[in-house]
From Swiss-Prot:
Protein name per the record: Putative hydroxypyruvate isomerase
Biological source species: Mus musculus (Mouse)
Function recorded in the entry: Catalyzes the reversible isomerization between hydroxypyruvate and 2-hydroxy-3-oxopropanoate (also termed tartronate semialdehyde).
Tree of life domain: Eukaryota
Entry EC number(s): 5.3.1.22
Key words of the record: Isomerase
Gene: Hyi
Entry-linked InterPro entries: HyI-like, Sugar_Epim/Isomerase, Xyl_isomerase-like_sf, Xyl_isomerase-like_TIM-brl
Top enzyme class: isomerase
Length: 277
């Protein structure tokens, strides 16, 4: 089995540094060959592309814009009445992805509207999401890009988020039926919502285009204490033939580089793979 390929999520890692270009440089110095950025839109794509190139990094994932952050929006894909804004945000994300050479975009579903009952609006929100995803799949296909759906847990992180379980996301992907749309598996969220990680990984991995990791419940380094045995989980991903990237989307408990001892141990044991696509 090939060793896993890890990417530094510089929206989370290196918080001791002020900006995304500085964090990209730090990720390269720490040994990463790939990086991801949740929201790159505060920087010009040219500045980010230059920083990534200087750092020897391949950018592998960005998110669509949040929407109106002051109004509490966290993505727009499933939000009724915000279809035009979702499509505008998608266009912006595609421009960034092309400029950065980034092959994947997380298509954020968004939150259940404030004051609405989740059960009452679920059908309408799913209909909006499916329509938006069909549109997005066509736009992305023209640029040879992949769109990702990420369930975010509603127990701890975001109680209002619409898409919260892998089964819900997989069912929506099946309704959309586009090969360039895939699952984004954040093991932190999946553990909190469903547990049963071995079964869920084996069931859903064929449709997974990207993985992210953090310890549960504090969202710290995989090497920190918590519910998850990452030695086992990394081996499981290898055994199941996962060939995508594993994003380090966690909250460092202290100095980021010191906290990467778990990853250095993995590289010492399994080798440092080429990044590829």
């Amino acid at each position: 089995m090939a060793p896993l390929r890890f990417s530094a999520n510089v929206s989370w890692l290196f918080p001791e540094l002020p900006g995304l270009p500085e964090r990209l440089h730090a990720a390269g110095r720490a040994g990463f060959k790939a990086a991801e950025v949740a929201w790159p839109y505060t920087e010009s794509p040219q500045a980010l592309a230059s920083a990534a190139q200087t750092a020897g990094l391949r950018l592998v994932l960005i998110n669509t814009p949040r929407g109106d952050h002051e109004k509490g929006e966290m993505g727009l894909g499933a939000v009724p009445g915000r279809q035009a804004a979702f499509r505008e945000g998608l266009e912006q994300a595609v421009l960034y992805a092309k400029a950065l050479g980034c092959p994947r975009i997380h298509l954020m579903a968004g939150r259940v509207p404030q004051g609405a009952d989740r059960a009452a609006v679920k059908g309408e929100m799913e209909t909006v999401f499916v329509e938006n995803l069909k549109h997005a799949a066509g736009v992305l296909a023209q640029e040879n890009l992949v769109g990702l759906l990420e369930p975010i847990n509603t127990r701890i992180t975001d109680p209002q988020y619409f898409l919260d379980t892998p089964r819900q996301a997989a069912a929506i992907l099946q309704k959309v039926g586009r090969p360039n749309l895939q699952l984004q598996m954040d093991i932190f969220h999946w553990q909190i919502m469903d547990g049963n990680l071995t079964g869920n990984i084996r069931e859903f991995l064929p449709t997974v285009g990207h993985v992210q990791v953090a310890q549960v419940p504090d969202r710290g380094e995989p090497g920190s204490s918590g519910e998850l045995d990452f030695t086992y989980l990394f081996q499981l991903l290898e055994d199941e033939g996962y060939q995508g990237f594993v994003g380090c989307e966690y909250r460092p408990r202290g100095d980021t580089v010191e906290g990467l001892s778990w990853l250095r141990s993995y590289w010492d044991r399994r080798g440092h793979p080429r990044t590829g696509q």
